[in-house]
């Protein structure tokens, strides 16, 4: 996965002129070389989209590690950044964790549709996903995920409901937990607030914004199979 993502990034900054702008008259820049062959192959574009997501789940330095997720509320669209925890390509599932008391989960309870956005500036590639959410609270998946969660991260679920008003700047944590990890007994109280959000991907919109080899493609899931088509960028 790392090699795939790194190679795509290389195509974004390839063969620049001495002035710092792309030299459109440079034959080597215009040819379909090893860095740009994938831009002419839908199956490789699809593989690249999944590589970006998988890399995001496994590497905290990846720009796809913190995608934006948009939901719908009574006041209109709401968007926030989440931490991508798991990608299952075979099942077309993305997973991240959330507080059941927060607006994101509340909104998904009312309307499970969600949009996901991620952008890799080095690779000059954007992903937009259309998804439907399933919420896992208190079940086997939630429990196994909670048990594998870093104790420091569990502190997030030991605070008042997200968005609660405060008279002063606050983390929401009790003073003893401000500077240390909670014990297993202490963190256990947060499990009731813990939720795993599983997003079933129904469509992937992939956009590569290279100055010369600009490309866009969409992949839609139909009867368990992905169908891809080129789009005008």
Give the residues covered by each predicted segment:
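Binding-site signature for planar aromatic cofactors or substrates
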Residues: 2-16, 22-233
């Amino acid at each position: 996965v790392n090699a795939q993502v790194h190679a795509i990034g290389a195509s974004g900054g390839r063969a620049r002129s001495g002035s710092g702008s792309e030299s459109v008259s440079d034959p080597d820049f215009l040819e379909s070389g090893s860095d740009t062959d994938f831009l002419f192959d839908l199956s490789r574009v699809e593989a690249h989209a999944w590589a970006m997501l998988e890399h995001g789940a496994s590497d905290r330095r990846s720009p796809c590690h913190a995608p934006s997720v948009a939901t719908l509320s009574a006041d209109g669209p709401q968007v926030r950044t989440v931490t991508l925890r798991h990608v299952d390509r075979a099942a077309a599932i993305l997973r991240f964790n959330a507080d059941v008391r927060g607006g994101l989960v509340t909104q998904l309870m009312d309307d499970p549709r969600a949009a996901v956005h991620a952008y890799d500036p080095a690779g000059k590639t954007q992903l937009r996903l259309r998804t439907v959410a399933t919420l896992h609270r208190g079940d086997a998946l939630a429990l196994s995920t909670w048990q594998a969660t870093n104790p420091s991260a569990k502190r997030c679920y030991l605070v008042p409901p997200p968005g609660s008003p405060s008279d002063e700047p606050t983390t929401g944590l009790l003073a003893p937990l401000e500077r240390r990890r909670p014990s297993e007994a202490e963190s256990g109280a947060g499990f009731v607030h813990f939720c795993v959000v599983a997003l079933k991907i129904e469509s992937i919109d992939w956009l590569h914004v290279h100055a010369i080899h600009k490309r866009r493609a969409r992949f839609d899931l139909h009867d368990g199979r992905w169908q891809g088509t080129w789009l005008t960028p």
